[in-house]
């Protein structure tokens, strides 16, 4: 999805949005991250989950959402165009009624493992605290 702004009778793209649901395949996430990183405008990556458990975000088999996001951003970091551009990451757990979000900028690639808790193996959405991640609980 793209958001446009009308300026002097012309439409200019100002935001790209990509959506995922469930714990989808890494290739599917990679495709969306490559698009967001390569574009000149800001982006948003929204991932909707039914629920999370101890292996949802990071695990030894590297099949968690953070594992896949880390690998995708690592692989495409050289494609990032603009120092001022940002990508907002939003992950929502419906059953737990929790939303986590973070803004990622080019300088975050220096600490990408920390951003995605790669060495800590965070599993459930309730475990995601710090490293720039914010939490919001819905009722």
Task: Give each language-model segment a name.
Residues 5-10, 77-80:
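Alpha-helix termini
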Residues 3, 18, 44, 108, ...:
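Intrinsic disorder/low-structure terminal segments
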Residues 4-6, 52-53:
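Short regulatory "switch" loops immediately downstream of catalytic or recognition motifs
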Residues 1-5, 12-23:
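Conserved catalytic cores of phosphodiester-cleaving nucleases, focusing on short active-site segments
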Residues 25-47, 65-77:
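Short, charged, amphipathic alpha-helix that recurs within catalytic cores of restriction-modification
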Residues 15, 41-50, 89:
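Hydrophobic beta-strand segments of well-ordered beta-sheets in folded domains
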Residues 21-26, 52-55:
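Short acidic, S/G/P-rich loop/turn micro-motifs used as interaction or catalytic elements
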Residues 49-139:
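Domain-level recognition of nuclease-like catalytic cores that cleave nucleotide substrates
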């Amino acid at each position: 999805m793209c958001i446009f702004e009308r300026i002097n009778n012309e439409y200019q793209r100002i935001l790209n949005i990509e959506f995922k649901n469930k714990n989808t395949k890494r290739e599917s996430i990679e495709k969306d991250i490559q698009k967001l990183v390569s574009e000149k405008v800001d982006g948003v990556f929204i991932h909707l989950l039914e629920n999370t458990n101890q292996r949802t975000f990071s695990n030894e088999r590297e099949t968690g959402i953070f594992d896949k996001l880390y690998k995708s951003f690592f692989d495409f970091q050289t494609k990032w165009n603009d120092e001022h551009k940002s990508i907002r990451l939003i992950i929502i757990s419906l059953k737990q009624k929790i939303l986590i979000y973070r803004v990622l900028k080019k300088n975050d690639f220096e600490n990408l493992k920390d951003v995605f808790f790669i060495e800590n193996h965070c599993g459930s959405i309730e475990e995601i605290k710090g490293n720039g991640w914010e939490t919001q609980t819905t009722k």
